[in-house]
């Protein structure tokens, strides 16, 4: 049995066994477990499992185990459950000798009541933010892979222009790399539509069609569609993914209503046809123009804040981004990044936000130096620091800085310092969405590599100095504990 399989089975035991698990899924660093009864979860045992870097309680229990490991752990849990990742795990409650129906009903009612309270507590805004995260989390590997391949193509192009490399095969290679990159970015509206449909309860294929509708495929020359509000021609992709998400949300409402009123015998034919006609027309003539206005305004505001605020805006964004990652709300920026790239050719927000992770790396390096006697902490840092340099910060957040408290705050200050440098230099953007840290370098636009490196070094230094001077306690330096 591999260590990942052992970790998966220990996690299952700590959350109350397979009988207490409703479904399992994962993102880049977290195993996301939906349990039937929170009271059966042993939180302390879960947190102290070797390999678990942190635990977040939300609608799902999110167990941070780190990149790479998370896929193996989640897949093994799915194998043990007998279903695919994300699918509900069946539980046999038909045995009357083993089943106390009265207790089961009471427990179910209690669970539903707690879930309802949790939803009320979370509020509509948090629900919206989580929906956006659920739409884009499955796309993160594609963003990273396609973005880095596009970045490599850009670097090769720059080297050709500078005369360092040449040859027809290099040109062909660059073309192939760009085709692979565009396989993701050119059809992002379709991918977004499919995932949005899954999130809102619509048919995924119909969501993909609505996303594809915004691309205005086949519209060219005199055969154009007009913006009913401005009289100008509609542009392919106008309204961006913000328009797609809203349109698919409307699609989910229309489709559900149609399922209720259309007879079963013709439901499979009538419902998708009418749903696509209604929402397709609304998307082209209403949602695309309005969402286009919203997207343009949003990008203008963000660019204005970064441009006018400079050092100050950079510090605020860099310092506040780690708490957003901690809360899982950083995915709200994904639509903004994409719209900035579509309109400006680069997102000037991402390099500033990336400084948060660099500040945390600096803080972790200071802990490595200051806490030489704390072997538990240093062992955790051995696994979390390398991926931190590459822009994956959750293992450091949940495994190191957040449990210790002070280093989390000093890491935020380090991120703010790096963000201030990026904001002060200005015009440092990323051509695509990808990981932060050193891994973002190939994606930096307009050859502003040195400016980005300066920001990274400033964040490393700021996080290191602040943590070295103010981020540790005597207990951290002298004991073998990771936190209270």
UniProtKB/Swiss-Prot annotation:
Protein localization: Cell membrane
Domain spans labelled PTS EIIB type-1: 5-87
Domain annotation PTS EIIC type-1: ranges: 130-484
Catalytic class of the enzyme: transferase
Record-annotated membrane-spanning stretches: 135-155, 160-180, 200-220, 234-254, 274-294, 305-325, 349-369, 384-404, 408-428, 450-470
EC number: 2.7.1.-
GO function terms (MF aspect): kinase activity; protein-N(PI)-phosphohistidine-sugar phosphotransferase activity; protein-phosphocysteine-N-acetylmuramate phosphotransferase system transporter activity
Topology relative to the membrane: Multi-pass membrane protein
List of catalytic residues: 27
Single biological process term from Gene Ontology: phosphoenolpyruvate-dependent sugar phosphotransferase system
Catalysed conversion reaction: N-acetyl-beta-D-muramate-(1->4)-N-acetyl-D-glucosamine(out) + N(pros)-phospho-L-histidyl-[protein] = 6-phospho-N-acetyl-beta-D-muramate-(1->4)-N-acetyl-D-glucosamine(in) + L-histidyl-[protein]
Entry's Gene Ontology cellular component terms: plasma membrane
Keyword list, A-Z: Cell membrane, Kinase, Membrane, Phosphotransferase system, Sugar transport, Transferase, Transmembrane, Transmembrane helix, Transport
SUPFAM superfamilies: Glucose permease domain IIB
Record CDD domains: PTS_IIB_glc
InterPro entries in the record: Glu_permease_IIB, PTrfase_EIIB_Cys, PTS_EIIC, PTS_EIIC_1, PTS_IIB_1, PTS_Sugar-Specific_Components
Gene3D superfamilies: Glucose permease domain IIB (3.30.1360.60)
A Pfam family recorded for this sequence: PTS_EIIB
Annotated pathway: Cell wall biogenesis; peptidoglycan recycling
Statement: the UniProt record of this protein carries the keyword Cell division: no
Record's keyword annotation contains Magnesium: no
Job description of the protein: The phosphoenolpyruvate-dependent sugar phosphotransferase system (sugar PTS), a major carbohydrate active transport system, catalyzes the phosphorylation of incoming sugar substrates concomitantly with their translocation across the cell membrane. This system is involved in the uptake and phosphorylation of MurNAc-GlcNAc, the principle peptidoglycan turnover product of S.aureus, yielding cytoplasmic MurNAc 6P-GlcNAc.
Domain comment quoted from the record: The EIIB domain is phosphorylated by phospho-EIIA on a cysteinyl or histidyl residue, depending on the transported sugar. Then, it transfers the phosphoryl group to the sugar substrate concomitantly with the sugar uptake processed by the EIIC domain. The EIIC domain forms the PTS system translocation channel and contains the specific substrate-binding site.
Full protein name: PTS system MurNAc-GlcNAc-specific EIIBC component
Protein source organism: Staphylococcus aureus (strain MRSA252)
């Amino acid at each position: 049995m591999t260590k990942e399989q052992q970790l998966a089975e220990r996690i299952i035991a700590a959350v109350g066994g397979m009988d207490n698990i409703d479904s399992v899924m994962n993102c880049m660093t977290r195993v996301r477990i939906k349990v039937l009864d929170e009271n059966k979860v042993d939180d302390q045992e879960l947190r102290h499992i070797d390999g678990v870097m942190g635990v977040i309680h939300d609608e799902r229990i999110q167990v941070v185990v780190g990149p790479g490991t998370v896929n193996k752990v989640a897949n093994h849990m799915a194998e043990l459950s007998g279903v695919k990742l994300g699918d509900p795990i069946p539980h046999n409650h038909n045995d009357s000798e083993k089943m106390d129906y009265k207790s089961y009903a009471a427990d179910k009612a209690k669970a539903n009541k707690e879930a309802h309270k949790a939803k009320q507590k979370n509020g509509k805004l948090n629900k919206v933010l989580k929906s956006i995260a659920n739409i884009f989390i499955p796309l993160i590997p594609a963003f990273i892979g396609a973005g880095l391949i596009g970045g490599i193509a850009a670097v090769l192009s720059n080297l050709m222009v500078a005369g360092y490399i040449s040859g027809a095969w290099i040109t062909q290679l660059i073309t192939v790399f760009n085709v692979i990159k565009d396989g993701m970015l050119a059809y992002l509206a379709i991918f977004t539509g499919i995932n949005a449909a899954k999130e809102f309860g619509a048919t995924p294929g119909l969501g993909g069609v609505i996303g594809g509708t915004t691309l205005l495929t086949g519209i060219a020359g005199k055969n154009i569609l007009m913006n009913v509000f401005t009289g100008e021609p509609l542009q392919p992709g106008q309204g961006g993914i913000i328009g797609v998400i809203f349109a698919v949300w409307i699609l989910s409402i229309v489709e559900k209503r149609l399922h209720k009123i259309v007879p079963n015998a013709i439901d499979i034919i009538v419902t998708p046809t009418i749903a696509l006609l209604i929402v397709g027309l609304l998307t082209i003539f209403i949602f695309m123009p309005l969402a286009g206005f919203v997207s343009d305004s949003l990008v203008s505001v963000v660019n204005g804040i970064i441009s006018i605020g400079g050092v100050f805006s950079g510090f605020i964004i860099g310092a506040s981004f780690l708490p957003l990652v901690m809360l899982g709300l950083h995915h709200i920026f994904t639509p903004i990044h994409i719209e900035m790239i579509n309109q400006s050719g680069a997102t000037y927000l991402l390099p500033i936000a990336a400084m948060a992770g660099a500040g945390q790396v600096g803080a972790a390096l200071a802990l490595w130096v200051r806490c030489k006697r704390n072997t538990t902490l240093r062992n955790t840092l051995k696994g979390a620091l390398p991926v931190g340099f590459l822009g994956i910060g959750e293992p450091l957040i949940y495994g190191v800085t957040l449990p210790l408290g002070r280093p989390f705050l000093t890491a935020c200050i380090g991120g703010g310092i790096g963000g201030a440098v990026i904001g002060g230099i200005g015009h440092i953007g990323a051509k695509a969405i990808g990981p932060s840290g050193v891994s973002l370098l190939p994606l930096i636009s307009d050859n502003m590599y040195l400016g980005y490196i300066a920001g990274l070094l400033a964040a490393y230094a700021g996080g290191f100095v602040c943590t070295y001077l103010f981020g540790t306690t005597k207990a951290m330096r002298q004991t073998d504990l990771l936190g209270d």
